[in-house]
């Protein structure tokens, strides 16, 4: 059985906007990319700019490979709380 999904509020996610803890939202899923910053092919700067917020639009605009999408899954720590999702 799958473990219960961990939900994070937007307020909580927004606190993780620095190099010691870098979280992002993509498609309502929360990613901890702290350890990925230096490995990001697009550079860490773009991730830092989006840190603590929703980067879905930028992620899709840039276009990411299937490999990138598969890799990104390993950094998922939970999901954005349903109450904080756009209606």
Curated annotation (Swiss-Prot):
How is it placed in the membrane, per its record?
Single-pass membrane protein
Query: What are the protein's GO molecular function terms?
Result: heme binding; metal ion binding
Q: Which UniProt keywords apply?
A: Acetylation, Electron transport, Endoplasmic reticulum, Heme, Iron, Membrane, Metal-binding, Microsome, Transmembrane, Transport
The name this protein carries in UniProt is Cytochrome b5
Main localization category: endoplasmic reticulum
Is DNA damage set as a keyword in this record? no
Protein task: Cytochrome b5 is a membrane-bound hemoprotein functioning as an electron carrier for several membrane-bound oxygenases.
Q: Which family does it belong to?
A: Belongs to the cytochrome b5 family.
Give me the residues that bind heme, please: 40, 64
Positions of modified residues (N6-acetyllysine): 6, 15
Q: What gene is this protein a product of? A: CYB5A
Q: Which organism is it from?
A: Alouatta seniculus (Red howler monkey)
Q: Name one GO cellular component term.
A: endoplasmic reticulum membrane
The superkingdom listed in its UniProt entry is Eukaryota
Q: PANTHER family attached here? A: CYTOCHROME B5
Q: Where in the cell is it found?
A: Endoplasmic reticulum membrane; Microsome membrane
Domain Cytochrome b5 heme-binding, chain residue ranges per copy? 5-81
């Amino acid at each position: 059985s799958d473990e219960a999904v961990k939900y994070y509020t937007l307020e909580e996610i927004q606190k993780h906007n620095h190099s010691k803890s870098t979280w992002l939202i993509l498609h309502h899923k929360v990613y901890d990319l702290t350890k990925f910053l230096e490995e990001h092919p697009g550079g860490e700067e773009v991730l830092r700019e989006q840190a603590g917020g929703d980067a879905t639009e930028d992620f899709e605009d840039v276009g990411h490979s299937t490999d990138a999408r598969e890799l990104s899954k390993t950094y998922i720590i939970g999901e954005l709380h349903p109450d904080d999702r756009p209606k």
